[in-house]
Amino acid sequence: MKKNVFIIGLDDFNLQMLQSVRNAENCNFIRLLDIQKLIDTNAYRLSDMLELAVEQLDQFEGSIDAIVGYTDFPVSTMVPILCEKYGVPGPTLESVLKCEHKYWSRLEQQAAIPEHIPQFTPFDPFDDQALEKIPFSFPFWIKPIKSTASQLGFRIRSKKDFPKAIQILREKIGLFKPFDALLDKIALPEAVAGINSAYCVAEQIISGRQCTLEGY
């Protein structure tokens, strides 16, 4: 019997790729939600998307054998919530948030391989003294603690770059506020509690070979 594999935001291109992998004939790949609504970067309606996903899954008459995704926020954070709800294997929400929250992920990386992690620090972009509180020299990156597709990431080469970047961050950082509702669902470590989507992280430049989790 074929397994029913729900894929959040599945499009035709990726469906063709999935159908070419080994043992694909043993799976029914089922589209869960429209990809264009999920990647609408003007507004991440996470709670609405979860409600629609639950509605579609509840109406399905067959077995739900797997729920996966292949894109960034909000899909990446929807997967663990839906997997837990429907009792299928998947990552925990905490493990995903550790990777998605840029400051938390840097703390985890620093604990595991401190010799390879450059300096970093969180800061409030609405603090007029933020630049003076960053404890390392130029150049460095600043970015929201939650972003996707490299949005709102700025390379700060000198003092004059900082105000320009901060102005844009202050205007647009609210885009990722839905991320805070996910942080409220778990017990955050003391070092991370309070560092929500309104915060940024500054970090020194890192160089080297870059590989994805998939090996690319």
Description of each model-found segment:
Residues 22, 112, 137, 168-172:
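Alpha-helix boundary/capping residues
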Residues 1-95, 126-129:
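ATP-binding N-terminal substructure of ATP-dependent carboxylate-amine bond-forming enzymes
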Residues 160, 166-216:
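Phosphate-binding site of ATP-dependent enzymes
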